[in-house]
Amino acid sequence: MTSTVDVLAYIPSPPQGVWYVGPVALRAYALFIIVGIVVAIVWGDRRWVARGGEKGTVLDIAIWAVPFGLIGGRLYHVMTDWPTYFGEGGDPVDALKVWQGGLGIWGAVALGGVGAWIGCRRRGIPLPALGDAVAPAILLAQAIGRLGNYFNQELYGRETEVPWGLEIFERRNDVGQVSPQLIDGVSTGEVAFVVHPTFLYEALWNVLIVLLLVWVDRRFRIGHGRLFALYVAGYCAGRFWIELMRSDHASLIAGVRVNSFTSALVFVAALVYFFAATKGREDPAELRPADGGPVGGGGEPVDGEIAQKEPEKNVEDAGKDEGTSASEPVSDDKAASTASTGGEAGTKTIDSKKDDAND
């Protein structure tokens, strides 16, 4: 009787993580990643506007940050799990198959930050301030993305008998292969083993840190990248102990899982930044791009603008200015007088230019 109750209390895995609509594959992992990105952009933009920024800024920055983040996340995953793709029995082409899962958060944050920096430079806004605005939204997006791991039957912990243990099913694909690691497969109904749902632990931890960040931001009104640093430190603290519960294959550094090692280093760096950064919050005026420079017009030309030359007068207009007509004959005495006057004027002009050059 006790055994039956325990089994009924286990969390079942989804029967599959991929559905096909004709030739199109709908992958739960990709859908949750997309939902997380949308939530991060929408909520992040609202927080940015509430802090004094312009509406739509986060979307503009995301155009740079999201592609960079996806590439960085995949690169980190491949580098820290390289035997899967480049070791014995591995296929290097699989490293490009992002839809099969495998994004490292550290690579996503690092390279995504580079993309955000580029976007902020183009918009003329401070990157630390943007990071503070989107920090809770990014962490909530991470929690949503972890549900994709649930459908893929991945990122789980050691085997357990706790009532909230996760059932991992055997899955069969189209060619008849049977394994719990088949992302494209469908459950056979047979339970391979029961494990700690570490992806769920991380998702719940992320939600708790999101609530903490929102409270701290409202209570203390911190800025200059310090809230983002608090997000990084909080996430690292949770990721460190969750990694210790995982039993899946991972690269090791001095016998420690690489993600635990990275979490510890980044945690320390985040705390150092948190205490060293400027206190208080940015002035709302700093969150809006500066107005464009002055537009040239009359008066002195501004930088980057070329002064317009006065249009040259034709012979007929010049004659009218001198009080003569182009068709009126000019006497020899008058012509000589005009030439003499023009010569003197030319000499004065040359002398004047010499004086200007010597100033």
UniProtKB/Swiss-Prot annotation:
It is a multi-pass membrane protein. The chain crosses the membrane at residues 24-44, 58-78, 98-118, 124-144, 193-213, 222-243, 258-278. Its EC number is 2.5.1.145. Keywords: Cell membrane, Membrane, Transferase, Transmembrane, Transmembrane helix. The keyword Membrane applies. It comes from the Bacteria. A 1,2-diacyl-sn-glycero-3-phospho-(1'-sn-glycerol) binds at residue 146. GO terms for biological process: lipoprotein biosynthetic process. Residues 306-323, 350-359 have a biased composition (Basic and acidic residues). The keyword Transmembrane applies. It is found in: Cell membrane. Catalyzes the transfer of the diacylglyceryl group from phosphatidylglycerol to the sulfhydryl group of the N-terminal cysteine of a prolipoprotein, the first step in the formation of mature lipoproteins. This is Phosphatidylglycerol--prolipoprotein diacylglyceryl transferase. It comes from Rhodococcus jostii (strain RHA1).
